[in-house]
Amino acid sequence: PDRRQRQMCIRDRVEAVPAIGALATIGVVYGALICWVQEDVKKLVAYSSVSHLGFCVLGLFALNPSGLQGSILYMINHGLSTGALFLLIGMVYERYHTRDMNRLGGLVANMPIWSAFMVFFVLSSLAVPGLNGFVSEFLCLIGAFSATPDNAQWPGLLGPWYAVFAGTGMILAAMYLLYLTGRLVWGPFRAPPADKNSGLPTDLSSREIGLLLPLALMCVWLGVQPSGLMRTLEPSVERTLAAYPELVPTQVESMAVLEEVNGG
């Protein structure tokens, strides 16, 4: 029963691959463009999640080991880096009760530790080599790029153009996240009066540092040594793709016949 269920699941997924791949690519670019018009920092990070998870879907529907491993790894990495960004935004809000970028800036002057964590997790979210996001994003793009019908081992219905268009989202992400960092961290200090009743220090407290530091260490570990986690994922990926070689060639042949009929 488990094998039949997997076959049904993968068969349905194979039939939907071109449409889902297109939607994922659109989501990557569209989510990045929406980020440009946001003045609320929390909304910007939330919409960036829409863009980032488009890579996750693209890798998942590449239906090959690289894409599937990258997609699962992306979910973990996204939870680390974006979760940390939400924590950092909340820590600023607790002090100044605003998330408006027009009212916040130059926070490195008063909050150097917060600023260091902010820059670090922005770089993690940007998939800078050496940090966790790079490996998963690279695998998702490689999976989509190499998933072509003429690939004998892992044929698929995506291809290079999906990866190329999704790659533009990486450029847009770098632009809006670096713009966000530049406005919040650097420049002249600007912020509403701090809430003295919050009981919080000007910069991060030891408790807040204790929350962020393990996330930062995980980002470094997964960026430098992802092989341990990827080996753990391999059995699940192999089981998921067990019926794939039987189903995809059939789907490719069906699409070729349909194209000939439509062409005739």
Residue map of PLM features:
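Single conserved hydrophobic/aromatic residue that forms the stacking wall/gate
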Residues: 1-6, 10
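Alpha-helical transmembrane segments and their helix-entry boundary regions
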Residues: 8, 44-45, 67-71, 75
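Structural signature of hydrophobic alpha-helical transmembrane segments
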Residues: 13-26, 75-80
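Residues that define the loop-to-transmembrane-helix transition and helix capping
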Residues: 18, 42, 68-69, 112-115
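Interfacial and helix-entry/exit segments of alpha-helical transmembrane bundles
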Residues: 21, 46-52, 56, 81-173, ...
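C-terminal ends of transmembrane helices
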Residues: 29-46
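Helix-loop interface residues and adjacent transmembrane-helix termini in multi-pass membrane transporters
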Residues: 38, 65, 95-98
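Cytoplasmic/organellar membrane-interface segments at the starts of transmembrane helices
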Residues: 111-113, 177-264
